[in-house]
Amino acid sequence: MIVDYHMHLRDPDERVVHSLEAVERFVVAAAERGVDEIGFSEHVYYFRQTRRVWALDYQTERCVYDLDAYVEVVLEAKRQGMPVKLALEVDYVGEQQDELAALLAPYPWDYLLGSVHWIDGLAVDQQPGLWARASVDEVWRRYFAAVVELASSGHVDVLAHPDLAKIFRMRPDHIEYPALDGVALEISTAGLRKPVGELYPAAAMLEAGPPITLASDAHVPADVGRDFDRAVVHARAAGYETVSVFEGRKARQEPLG
């Protein structure tokens, strides 16, 4: 089975649009690329219901969409038999993580992605961001500390782009990858389209054998399932024969491929 569990509903011009027509475009693209099931995982800070947990202008400027409408669109697609799952990409927000989890708890998610883009209000995947305030070693240390905190919170099911800190090809001389229990890791092809030019995560993060999903981080239908041949090779090289399939925040294992 091939799943793509990380994508964002957009129109052909990459504008946010939470509509059944947009869902259908992504579903058609998935079928054309041999992807059996897709999951929509919009950024949590796009929804006004979560407004009170955000502090950065980047987040609050985008916090204008209706979470209930987004959920209903994906649920309607499911009712119509489309092979889609309902999810969100849940950002690390430190002390506000419990509050954010409580806001999201009433909704019927199939899974929740966890990601770390900001630490103490400074971006990891944008420059200058945290890179202007801390050494490379310190950025990585703080990044993985946040990843571990998010993974151990019980609030997310899958970690998105788990070693995002490598995005600009700046790495410590020695990287200590943390033990991450209780969550799956996505093998993401998005890194191939970033300055690092690599899949997320590094093979070393898969050595302990955590459950995996596959992800494109598509913002347009053309990127659904993109470079998944390389993602599958990466997974098999690490010893994987199955992929996690989620429903109602419960995972089962299905044969990979």
Language-model segments: which ranges?
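Acidic (Asp/Glu)-rich catalytic clusters
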Residues: I2, A31-E32, E72-G81, A101-D110, ...
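Domain-core and long-helix interface of multi-subunit machines
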Residues: Y107, G114-A208
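An N-terminally biased module of ancient metal coordination in phosphate/nucleic-acid-related enzymes
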Residues: M1-G94, I167-Y177, H219-D223, A237
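Charged catalytic cores and adjacent phosphate/nucleic-acid-binding surfaces used
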Residues: M1-P12, R171-G257
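Structural preference for beta-strand elements that scaffold enzyme active sites
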Residues: M1-D4, E37-G39, P83-A87, D110-L113, ...
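Generic structural signal for well-ordered alpha-helices
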Residues: V23-V28, L67-L75, F144-V147, A202, ...
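Short, acidic/polar
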Residues: H18-A29, E95-L103, R141-L150
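A cross-domain feature marking catalytic cores of carbohydrate-active enzymes
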Residues: M7-L9, E42, L86-Y92, S115-V116, ...
